Regions:
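Surface-exposed aromatic
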Residues: 39-46
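Helix N-cap motif at beta-to-alpha junctions
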Residues: 47-52
Length: 77
């Protein structure tokens, strides 16, 4: 079973990579872009067959490694 996870900076946390991308896009004439937030995307293949158990396991992974809970949020898809 494949579980997908998106990790993004929390609202209010500075995102220097996102800001740099936004500024570069503006300089390339994409002037309508007012903000970019950069995050991480994970696809985790698990041998667990039960979706509920697999998502709970991936949630533990997010809390322990994949996301820095002080500055990042995560969403399991």
């Amino acid at each position: 079973m494949k579980i997908k996870v998106i990790v993004t900076p929390k609202n209010g946390v500075l995102d220097p990579q996102g800001k740099a991308i936004q500024q570069t896009l503006n300089s390339m004439n994409f002037i309508d872009v007012s903000e970019v937030r950069q995050g991480k995307y994970f696809e985790i293949e698990t041998e667990l067959k039960d979706e509920k158990d697999a998502k709970k396991n991936v949630e533990d992974m997010c809390k322990k490694l994949l996301a820095n809970l002080v500055i990042e949020d995560y969403k399991i898809l």
